[in-house]
Amino acid sequence: MAKVIGIDLGTTNSVVAVMDGSEPTVLENREGDRTTPSVVAFTKTGERLVGKVAKRQAITNPDRTIISIKRHMGSDYKVRIDDKAYTPQEISAMILSKLKADAEEKLGEKITQAVITVPAYFTDAQRQATKDAGTIAGLEVLRIINEPTAAALAYGLDKGEDQRILVFDLGGGTFDVSILELGGGTFQVIATAGNNKLGGDDFDERIVNYLADRFQREHGIDLRKDKQALQRLREAAEKAKIELSSVTTTNINLPFISMTADGPVHMDETLTRAKFEELTADLVEATMGPTRQALQDAGLEPGEIDKVLLVGGSTRIPAVQEAVRRFFGKEPYKGINPDEVVAMGAAIQAAVIKGDVKDVLLLDVTPLSLGIETLGGVFTKLIERNTTIPTRKSQIFSTAADGQTQVEIHVLQGEREMAAYNKTLGRFILDGIPPAPRGVPKIEVTFDIDVNGIVHVSAKDLGTGKEQKITIQSQTSMSKEEIERAIKEAEAMAAEDKKRREEAEIRNNADAAVYNAEKLIKESEGKGIDPSLIDAVKGAIEPVKEALKGTDVNAVKQATEKLTEAVYKLSSAIYEKTGSAGTGAGSQAGSAAGSGDGQSMDAEFKVKDEDK
């Protein structure tokens, strides 16, 4: 049976895992790393880069490097490269395509299905965008599950005792808190809260602004206006943040960061953990609001939580850990890898769906209330937040005016009393209502939330039986046609990437063939080898060198094949000469070794390890 992968599609980094027997295993990518930077870049020659290689060139190519695209999921944001505009779904699909390809290489089989995680506080539009990204990448997304829930699944799979846990998930761009009850193989979310605009990126930004302000005061130059300098500053800020989790002081040294009339200027700053904590104190405090909200919604006190799980790389920040410790009055649980646990949970859920893991039931909730706009601009809730999903709820409404023959259903998500202050998910019209006094027609509005947290709405005139149904498509969602077009483009880009890689391999092989051929010619000197064989190799080297100067890859390949053939003949001649010269000595040695009384003797051989 084909494997289903679990993917944590993160703001900063992404991770892939798969079930290996009864245990989830994180898969290394092509570079040998367990996490892949969620970075996409386009070179000036049109090549697409994803992951570590894209992140590495960001300083020299800031305008064409895309980071933290997850923060724009479900919005109308576009990335403009040359004459093309890419949606967040398309950029995310490029990341997913790499994760998929690397997993296929590691597992040695084709991957077509996945479970992808999203922040618990993602809206319907953001969830739909994530699912679309998976589709564009050539994946059937079996389930969209919440990151904290996935983490709890990975933590609690082998835990037999009943317990109540709180997952504190602070990632690169989002923050979630979920409270779950675990017991008897059931994982039930009872409350969730969060902030989709709070994460490690914001902590980095505080360091960037602090350093840029100090530099501007000293040199009169605002580094934030220089894209290359700003990218260097961002990378240095992220590095400093990470270092300050294990040391109390770090140095930020950026030579030649800018130029003045007097010449180059450098940045050499020291940042202490105390200063970093001062710069980010309000961000740490901002995590406490959703934490209190989740506890309030669950009707619990901090002391009633058995374990607090820290998830997401940003929970390594000491001030964050201290805030959690102080709030709950206990040490947070650190027995899980905060970077990998979400992907591992997704892999477990994938195995549950496929039937490979049994006796596990996952009950998640909707993070925000859902409803429609009614008379006076009021937001009327049909499904309250923290309702277990999947769920279905219906309510009867009527017309607001005499003789009204159609109604507009304005679907919203949020917690405010007035519709104008909540997020619009979509609108649709139910028409063909027979004219009648207001309040007489009966219109049944039904909300249906599936296991992915995606909303389906229907409106039915009970008098005529006429019904209108929609799966919510926000204004930022991609249409079926747009998704199909994006899939074709993604496939074309994948083919182009493969072609470029193959071309690079052909050129590398040609270069290596020339090097080895020239080395072989030197080795053949003075060995009495037929000069015509040496001349043949020399004659075959030049066409390869000439072909490498051009763009015709087939010419390079053909020239390399001819060189390889000539090298083979020369190598055979050298081998024959060397072999015949050593025949006599070898025979004598064999005789000596074979002499004696016919007894054999065991010998112990030690292999010298050249790497040591």
UniProtKB/Swiss-Prot annotation:
UniProt entry tagged with the keyword Nucleotide-binding: yes
A Pfam family that the UniProt record links to this protein: HSP70
InterPro entries membership: ATPase_NBD, Chaperone_DnaK, Heat_shock_70_CS, HSP70_C_sf, HSP70_peptide-bd_sf, Hsp_70_fam
Annotated stretches, region: Disordered: 579-612
Naturally occurring in which organism (per UniProt): Symbiobacterium thermophilum (strain DSM 24528 / JCM 14929 / IAM 14863 / T)
HAMAP family: DnaK
Listed GO MF terms: ATP binding; ATP-dependent protein folding chaperone; unfolded protein binding
PANTHER family: HEAT SHOCK PROTEIN 70KDA
Modified residues (Phosphothreonine): 174
Keyword tRNA processing: no
Classification via NCBIfam families: PRK00290.1, prok_dnaK
Protein name per Swiss-Prot or TrEMBL: Chaperone protein DnaK
Taxonomic classification: Bacteria, Bacillati, Bacillota, Clostridia, Eubacteriales
Biased composition (Gly residues): 581-597
Biased composition (Basic and acidic residues): 603-612
